[in-house]
C-alpha cells in the first residue's frame, strides 16, 4: 500500500530500504556492491542508500510517493557481509523487483544499478561486484548471434582451441601491406587474424580498402591450406548508419566474421549489431577496449564479471577475457570464473572464483573466451591448460615478432598448440611438463625452435591489482 501520510524532509534510508528479513524471489534481479561508506555512516544506512538511489528514491520525501506502491517497486538491501582483509569496505546485497526494468534492455538495468548512485555522497567508494539475472530477463535478451557450436560447424574445426593474431603495428600500415600480413599469418597456420580495437577508418587505412585486401588474403590462404580462415573486420564507427554500412559490405564480399568494440561503441549500438549478425549469418568478435577504466580499481567501478555477463546478454561470439599469463591484468581464479560465465549454461555461486550468485543462462549459447595480450609460444602449455578447447588464443607480437617473419611465427604457434593438445590428450600435465613438451616438439619444427629462443627471457611478472577478496585454499 502507498504511504498514508506525507512527511517532508531528508529521508532516513535505513528505515525504508533495509530489510534483512526479505526473502529473495526467483524473479528478482540481484546485485552485490562493495561499499566504502563515509565516516559516521552506518553499514545499514549506506546499504539502504545504495538500494534507494539505484531504484525508486530521491533525497527527500515527495508527495507523489502517495500515488504509487513504493513498497512493491523499491530495491531492498537484504544482507551485509564483511569484505575479507578490509576494515572499511563491506558487501551490500540488494534485490530489485522485476517490474523496475524494461524487458531485454541491459541499458535500462544498468542506468539504475550504476547510475547516479555512484556519485552519491553517503559512500566514498562503490563497486558493482556481481549481478544475478533471472531467467525471465535472460530470455528477453538476444544473446550470442551463433555461439561456440555453430561457429565450430561453420569453420569445421574441432578438438582444439582456435588460433588468432592481431595485426601489428596496430596503426600506420597501408591497406595492401595490412592484407599481406593477414595472408602470411593465415597461410602459416592461424585460423583468424584481427583488426586491433582502434583500427576503424583512418586516412592511411580506409575501411573499404582494408576489407577488400583482407578478404583477398583470406581467400588466397584458404585455397592454399584447404582450411576455413577469417579476419575480424572491425566495423566500429562513429554512427550506427556507418556501422551497418561496413557490416553489409563485409557480408557482400563474403567475410565470415566482423568485430565490435562493445564498450566504446555503446551498449545499444552493440546490441543492434548483434541482432544484425544473427539475421545475416555473421560471426561477431567482441573487444573490451575501455574495460579497465571501469573494472581495475578494486574499490570503485564495475567488476569485469559483470561486464562479461552484460556482453553475454547483448550478444557476441568471442570476448576478450584476459590471459592470466600475459601482459594484461587478470587474477587466475577470477579469470577462470569469467571463462565459466561466458561458456557454461549454468554457473553455481563460487566465492573462490568471485562468483556470488548462481546464474542460469537457459538456452542462450556460450561464446568463446579470447586470451590475448603479451602471449607467446612459451605460454602455450598454460593457456591450453587454463582455457581448454573452447577458446581463442590470440598471439599478436608473439606471431609477428618472429625473426623469420609472420608465416614462421604463425607456424610456430600452430605447432606448439598441436603439441600441447596431443600431450594433454595423452594425459600429461601441461603446466608442469610444458617446457619438455615444447622442447621435444621443436626438434621437428625449426620455426618453433627459433620462437622459443627468441622469447625465452620474456616475462610479465607484475602483480595483479584487482585481486579476489578471498583467500585461495
UniProtKB/Swiss-Prot annotation:
Cofactor list: Mg(2+)
Residue(s) at site: Transition state stabilizer: 327
Domain of life where this protein originates: Bacteria
Catalytic site: 168, 287
Cofactor binding remark: Binds 1 Mg(2+) ion per subunit.
Example of a GO biological process term: reductive pentose-phosphate cycle
Gene Ontology MF terms in the entry: magnesium ion binding; monooxygenase activity; ribulose-bisphosphate carboxylase activity
Enzyme Commission (EC) number: 4.1.1.39
UniProt-annotated binding residues for Mg(2+): 194, 196-197
Catalytic reaction list: 2 (2R)-3-phosphoglycerate + 2 H(+) = D-ribulose 1,5-bisphosphate + CO2 + H2O; D-ribulose 1,5-bisphosphate + O2 = 2-phosphoglycolate + (2R)-3-phosphoglycerate + 2 H(+)
Keywords: Calvin cycle, Carbon dioxide fixation, Lyase, Magnesium, Metal-binding, Monooxygenase, Oxidoreductase, Photosynthesis, Plasmid
InterPro entries per record: RuBisCO, RuBisCo_large_chain_AS, RuBisCO_lsu_C, RuBisCO_lsu_C_sf, RuBisCO_lsu_fd_N, RuBisCO_lsu_N_sf, RuBisCO_lsuI
Residue numbers binding substrate: 116, 166, 170, 288, 320, 372
Residues annotated with N6-carboxylysine modification: 194
Residue runs in coiled coils: none
Function: RuBisCO catalyzes two reactions: the carboxylation of D-ribulose 1,5-bisphosphate, the primary event in carbon dioxide fixation, as well as the oxidative fragmentation of the pentose substrate. Both reactions occur simultaneously and in competition at the same active site.
NCBIfam families: PRK04208.1 (NF003252)
Additional notes on this entry: The basic functional RuBisCO is composed of a large chain homodimer in a 'head-to-tail' conformation. In form I RuBisCO this homodimer is arranged in a barrel-like tetramer with the small subunits forming a tetrameric 'cap' on each end of the 'barrel'.
Assigned protein family: Belongs to the RuBisCO large chain family. Type I subfamily.
Oligomer and partners: Heterohexadecamer of 8 large chains and 8 small chains.
Protein's UniProt name: Ribulose bisphosphate carboxylase large chain 2
Gene: cbbL2
